[in-house]
A protein has these predicted regions:
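Aromatic-patch recognition
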Residues: 22-174
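Generic marker of residues within folded, mature protein domains
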Residues: 6-9, 138, 180
Length: 202
């Protein structure tokens, strides 16, 4: 009996790590993610970037999809689809909004969905994400950043002023945000505010 249980656990673990599935596991766009109805199916190995890889090439500890099958879909998986699901977790493709290859774990899906990713490095994407203002030029970026996905699918850098605007209809949270005087690097604390706000929308 113990051997059967161990074998079952091993199979489930390997399936989760390698993303092998008989059901659809790829989201073509935001609407599929919102409805939780992936229309695409791939086999792949989900790997978190190692410290050595980050040291050599830069970036953050996000994820890569390896050994993608079918092989003729590699470009699509790396640069075009919205995201993938592995077990109970969802990973958003960073390339469409940042032009940086990799996948980021969705921390919470709700009225406002949020995750931590790498800042965009190109001017067009920096402007669209709110990293720079319309009149500003491209800037050098590094390290990780907080992102929020609005109800219409728009992705924005989670700035303190944006957080206040998103939660302004909740007096208690608005007061908490103002009192906290958040900085851009206070990603996890701002995520906690979004989590509280999402609870009011259920």
């Amino acid at each position: 009996m113990k051997q059967i249980i161990l074998t079952t656990i091993t199979i489930l673990y390997v399936s989760a790590i390698f993303g092998q599935t008989k059901t659809n596991n790829g989201f073509a766009d935001f609407n599929e993610f919102k409805l939780n109805k992936p229309s695409l199916k791939f086999d792949f190995q989900l790997k978190q970037r190692s410290g050595g890889d980050i040291f050599l090439t830069g970036g953050i500890s996000n994820y890569r999809l390896k050994k993608i099958k079918p092989v003729n879909e590699v470009g699509k998986v790396e640069e075009k689809i919205w995201g993938v699901t592995v077990g109970d977790s969802i990973y958003i493709n960073a390339y469409p909004f940042s032009k940086v290859k990799g996948y980021n774990l969705i921390i919470e899906k709700g009225y406002y969905t949020y995750f931590i990713g790498e800042p965009a490095r190109t001017e067009k994407e920096q402007r669209e994400l709110g990293i720079i203002k319309p009149t500003e030029k491209q800037i050098m970026v590094c390290c990780q950043a907080g992102y929020v996905i609005l109800p219409d699918g728009t992705i924005k850098l989670l700035r303190p002023e944006l957080l206040l605007d998103l939660c302004k209809d909740n007096d208690d949270l608005a007061k908490e945000i103002k009192a906290a005087n958040f900085k851009l690097e206070n990603v996890y604390k701002m995520n906690d505010i979004l989590k509280k706000y999402n609870l009011t929308k259920k």
